[in-house]
């Protein structure tokens, strides 16, 4: 799972150790390494998710592609957020996705394009049987993004760090049925 993902508007780059090191150093280092424009505030996160991904990839190089990805807007060569997985599939074949889009580029369909690409990419791996995601426990733009990716709301949970969350999932064997319903709606 190391390949770059291409969509209509995005080039989605898997973060290896070198890219994660550049993220941790700063925007200029990342810009120089990838020859892209890196705007201030491109991520809503502090560096902890990238630090964690770095440590995991450092310990398990084969997991490149199961952590962070960087979506680059092709026509501007601009970093517009981040996304990826929270590790390789577990024993049951479950992976979790996460994504974010740079605030000035939200509400343009980029989050949906990124999330769909991640879902499609994960399901290319025969070990993946189900994909999960979590949102805040209220209707928001992320809920609609996940619905457009074929995900269904499953339950509300409480997380000690994040509070109330809604859980979403799409099992591989239901994906085509859900997608056809969405596209015909």
Where are these regions (language model features)?
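GNAT-family acyltransferases
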Residues: 1-96, 101-104, 117-121, 125, ...
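Short alpha-helical segment within the catalytic ATP-binding CA
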Residues: 100, 113, 141
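Glycine-rich acyl-CoA binding loop
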Residues: 107-112
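Conserved GNAT acetyl-CoA-binding A-motif
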Residues: 125-134
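Conserved beta-strand-loop-alpha-helix junction that forms the acyl-donor binding cleft
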Residues: 133-143
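Conserved active-site tyrosine of GNAT-family acetyltransferases
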Residues: 146
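Surface-exposed, gly/pro-biased binding rims or lids
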Residues: 149
């Amino acid at each position: 799972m190391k390949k770059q993902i291409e969509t209509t508007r995005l080039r989605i780059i898997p973060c290896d150790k070198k890219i994660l090191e550049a993220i941790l150093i700063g925007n200029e280092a990342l810009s120089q390494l990838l020859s892209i424009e890196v705007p201030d505030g491109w991520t809503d996160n502090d560096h902890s998710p990238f630090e964690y991904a770095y440590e995991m990839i450092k310990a398990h190089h084969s997991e490149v592609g199961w952590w962070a990805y960087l979506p680059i807007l092709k026509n501007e060569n601009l970093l517009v957020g981040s996304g990826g997985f929270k590790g390789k599939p577990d024993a049951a074949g479950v992976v979790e996705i996460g994504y974010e889009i740079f605030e000035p580029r939200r509400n343009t369909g980029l989050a949906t394009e990124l999330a769909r690409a991640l879902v499609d990419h994960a399901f290319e791996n025969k070990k993946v049987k189900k994909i999960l995601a979590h949102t805040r426990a209220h209707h928001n733009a992320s809920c609609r993004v996940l619905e457009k990716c074929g995900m269904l709301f499953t339950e509300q949970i409480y997380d000690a760090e994040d509070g109330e969350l809604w859980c979403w999932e799409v099992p591989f064997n239901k994906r085509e049925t859900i997608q056809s319903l969405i596209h015909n709606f």
